[in-house]
Amino acid sequence: MSKSNSFRDVAVVSVASHQTKILSEVNEVQLMADLISNCRNSVGVTQEEIGFTCSGSSDFLAGQAFSFVHTLDSVGAFPPISESHVEMDGAFALYEAWVKLQIGEVDTALVYSYGKPSAGSIIDVLATQLDPYYVSPLWPDCFSIAALQARLLLDKGLITLEKMAETSMRSQKNGSDNPNAVRSSKDVSFENLMNEPAIVDPLRASDISEIADGGCAIILAAGDKAKSLCERPAWIKGIDHRVDSHTLGVRDLTRSPSAFLAAEKAGINADRLDLAEIHGMTSAQELILEKEFDLNEETRVNLSGGSLASDTMMASGLIRISEVASRIISGQVDRGLAHATSGPCLQQNLVCILEGE
């Protein structure tokens, strides 16, 4: 897809999210019940007024087939709903809901996603998405693969350890203002980050995203309905997703062509960007994305701390959209980019451009 100015106007009108290191007192249904209720109540809608519901989660992570069916209890047992699900990050569920709204049969949609990696082994789960013949049987962990990518960038002189540390420091300082940030510190120092030992060479602990449990809920509305529900909706001006080759060996891992193309098709260059929320598993990946999106000093990056501060499998991408949307709705920014990624080494990328009026 492409710039939405030739399509039906759709906006984010309400968001709710929560992330923590370990969800020890509630399960996924209880977590999402609160988030979905908060999301609906903030704009005064009931489930009867929601035309479509779409969720994103992982059966592999939950360890149970069709696990998302249980989480539908958080939406409510009644009334019956028009519902769909993607085994992907919630950002891709939002794309499906956006397409549904384009058809014109409904005016509102609820999107939510969640993950509880503390209950299992995220490195084993993510290994199953690799090439089933040559790579997955070796069970390489996601951080080791990301470390190979970082080493390629360093050896080619495209990034430095200093730039990686600066990116990690930015995340921790920005995250200090975000109650959902699991790893944050106003007092973090560049010297301390540089002196950290590598845990997956060349990545230090601060270079790797902080795994967190959590979830996110978003309500979309079209046209006049959006204006009636929200004083300042965050309009989706463009949304697109692209994918690179599944085979790591045929890709240039120092780049992300799919991220570049998705941003271009979404209309990144139509106006200035006040904010960018980008989704990367490592500081090196954030640097790749900043280059692919050609972000300059006028664009503030990851004011929430990004996924380096809190990374919830299946929800981090949707949370990036919610972070941009919430700042537009509150009037803090006028235009922003939200990015979500899936697969190893930035294989598949979604870009959403949001604007206020």
Task: Locate predicted features.
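Short, well-ordered, mixed-charge alpha-helical segments that flank or form enzyme active sites
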Residues: P117-S121, K173-N178, C345-L346
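Flexible, glycine/charged-enriched surface loops at secondary-structure junctions
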Residues: Q47-E48, I159-A165, N178-R183, R232-P233, ...
